[in-house]
């Protein structure tokens, strides 16, 4: 009988402690975003298109900060064979270099104006397991962030507009 009372008390105490934990704050990025621009800021200050003239993309973030991001160059080559396993070198190159996709969790630091993407999976496997930080602005439903400089010194800039 004593062991039943102790077990019951322990279960009730753990439930009370669980309910006392503060709720995780909702991500300010929660929702669906569409890509407005994907550009590169060159070392000389010139801004150029990074994923062609009409890039497309989606960024979807849930209330806990889990995200999925896709950016595509609209001018990617179609595979002449219609078979992904039988592409030609230029078709594979266009598919890989004409897209940027990854998913994981994103943390917003509003004080420092930074986003931290904790990448779980990516089209570029070297990013998997990485924590990438970006400076951002968020105003009037438009999110703009800068990616750290590439080896050539160019800084990618992504601009997203909230859909919902």
Where does each model-flagged region fall?
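Lipid interaction determinants
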Residues: 9, 15, 20-164
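A broad "ordered helical/assembly scaffold" signature
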Residues: 1, 13-14
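Bacterial N-terminal signal peptides that target proteins for export
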Residues: 1-8
């Amino acid at each position: 009988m004593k062991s039943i009372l102790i077990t019951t008390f322990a279960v009730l105490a753990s439930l009370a402690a669980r309910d006392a934990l503060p709720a995780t704050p909702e991500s300010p990025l929660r929702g669906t975003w569409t890509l407005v621009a994907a550009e590169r800021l060159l070392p000389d200050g010139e801004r150029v298109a990074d994923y062609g003239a009409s890039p497309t993309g989606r960024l979807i973030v849930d209330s806990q900060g889990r995200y999925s991001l896709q950016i595509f160059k609209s001018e990617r080559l179609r595979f002449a064979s219609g078979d992904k396993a039988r592409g030609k070198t230029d078709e594979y190159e266009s598919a890989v270099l004409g897209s940027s996709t990854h998913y994981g969790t994103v943390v917003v630091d509003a004080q420092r104006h930074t986003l931290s993407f904790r990448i779980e999976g990516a089209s570029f496997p070297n990013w998997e397991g990485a924590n990438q930080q970006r400076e951002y602005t968020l105003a009037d439903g438009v999110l703009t962030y800068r990616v750290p400089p590439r080896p050539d010194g160019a800084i990618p800039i992504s601009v997203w507009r909230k859909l919902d």
